[in-house]
Regions:
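Metal- or metallocofactor-binding catalytic centers and their adjacent structured scaffolds
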Residues: 1-39, 44-46, 355-359
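C-terminal (or distal) subdomains of carbohydrate-active enzymes
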Residues: 33, 37-455
Length: 455
């Protein structure tokens, strides 16, 4: 109910917003209490156990609360985030599917040399040569792996804003003529490097996007990945304004892939027909991707589900400021993260889908040593375990819901970290259809399969 269709777009009254905030905060607190109860650590102050909530192995940069200056055996650096919290970025931690790893904090900071060189408006990273314009947006980005210029049009991460007065429903609708009204906004107020080391560089900027509203943002470039992330805090005090972040790319392709539930949908990225023209605003979940045969750029986010795509341009919708029925509903502080990920291959599970999951699902951090046995894993890269839940009508059983994510055929083998008595294939209602002989499954493109695991 807290995700009801009148709550998500802001089309509810003020008291509902207030009640929902309290209820969600209470739900999150109870979830943390349950995690602490089910996964107790020994409380060792200088150690943490990291648990991977994903069904595939990961080795991306991990972010946890800093309890020391370094991490024993791993490249690391500390920084203060936009909330004023002291955090640590750690690289090189390999987490198996649903598995864990222990990290020990040290009093000695990592002394490895920085992988980045900033000279005026030019930034050199292990993956790209970047040039900033006077507003702090990325005017040029050359991929070192291909020598290719990626920017064509507005600089990457240009903020654009338009008047947003819908003809009918204030918070529900976006009218087609809004596209003609977008113009760059953002007066750069401050800009500084707040962290630079062997793991990443963080450039913190603050813009005024109007007389009343500001954006503060960390641009994060990584030594281990071509991804550029944007950790964003908006102080929003606008009415009937629509804000986007523009990424006008030099890619030439005839479609965009956008994630939906249990898969993705491919749409035209041109405006030739009336149907295509009506898709001036489309939806996505964790990613949208423009890919040629052997190169592409994914736009990844953690909570922003609307965007516009036209030829090589992707523009992520950051905020829509309707005033009815709650004129205060959108006012104040908003937090989000988004990123661009250039990849030197076409669209695949490894190039886009898995990094998008990693961006959205941070590992659980348990204080001290915690005894964690990996639940299960699947060996096909394009098969994802999307859900793990208790079985509705059986004790000593749980449900795995898996799906094929890339639009391809797959043979997949399940591996379990515990003894299994019986496996069966179920429908979505958990009604058994057949017993599973062994641990092998086949998947058609985007097929969802539900497995009952008895132990």
């Amino acid at each position: 109910m807290r995700q009801f269709h009148d709550i998500l777009p802001g089309t509810c009254i003020h008291s509902v917003h207030e009640e929902t905030r309290r209820a969600i905060a209470d739900t999150i607190a109870k979830a943390h209490e349950m995690t602490d109860k089910l996964l107790p650590g020994d409380g060792a102050a200088n150690e943490v156990t990291l648990i991977n909530p994903l069904s595939f192995e990961r080795s991306d940069v991990l972010y946890i609360d800093a309890r020391g200056e370094g991490a024993d055996g791993y490249a690391s650096q500390t920084f203060t985030d936009l909330d004023g919290k002291r955090r640590m970025a750690i690289a090189g931690v390999n987490l198996s599917a649903f598995g864990s790893a222990k990290v020990r904090f040290t009093d000695k900071a990592d002394s490895a040399a920085s992988a980045f060189k900033l000279n005026g408006d030019c930034l050199d990273t292990p993956f790209a040569c970047i040039t900033f314009n006077e507003t702090g947006a990325i005017a040029s980005m050359i991929d070192k792996r291909t020598g290719r210029e990626l920017v064509d049009g507005l600089p990457f991460n240009t903020f654009v804003m338009a008047e947003d007065v819908s003809a009918a429903w204030d918070n529900w609708d976006i009218d087609a003529d809004s596209e003609d009204k977008f113009a760059p906004v953002g007066k750069l107020l401050s800009r500084e490097v707040v962290s630079c080391g062997a793991v990443e560089m963080r450039i913190r900027s603050k813009w005024a996007i109007s007389e009343k509203s500001t954006i503060e943002q960390d641009m994060v470039v990584s030594a281990a990945s071509p991804m550029i992330a944007f950790d964003t805090v908006m102080d929003w005090h606008e009415g009937h304004r629509f804000l986007k972040a523009a990424f006008d790319t030099a890619l030439h392709c005839d479609g965009v892939r956008s994630e939906i539930q249990f898969g993705h949908i491919r749409r035209s990225n041109h405006r030739s027909t009336d149907v295509e023209k009506a898709r001036f605003e489309i939806c996505n979940h964790k990613y949208s991707d423009l890919s040629e045969n052997s190169y592409g750029i994914a736009l990844i986010n953690d909570c922003k589900y609307g965007l516009s795509v036209n030829e090589g341009s992707m523009r992520l919708s950051l905020h829509k400021g309707g005033l009815r029925p709650d004129k205060e509903g959108d006012m104040g502080r908003h937090v989000c993260r988004y990123a661009i990920l250039p990849h030197c291959e076409g669209f695949s599970a490894q190039s886009v889908i898995q990094p998008a999951y990693e961006f959205n699902y941070a590992p659980l951090a348990i204080s001290g040593n915690a005894d964690v046995t990996p639940l299960a894993s699947v060996d096909a890269k394009n098969v994802i375990v999307e859900s793990v839940k208790p079985c509705e009508d059986a004790q000593h059983a749980y449900i795995l819901r898996l799906y094929e994510a890339a639009g391809d055929y797959a043979n997949a083998n399940l591996t379990f970290g515990h003894a299994v008595k019986r496996l069966s294939i179920c429908n979505m209602l958990e009604e058994e259809q057949s017993e599973l002989d062994g641990t092998s499954l086949t998947f058609k493109p985007f097929q969802i399969r539900t497995v009952k695991v008895e132990y």
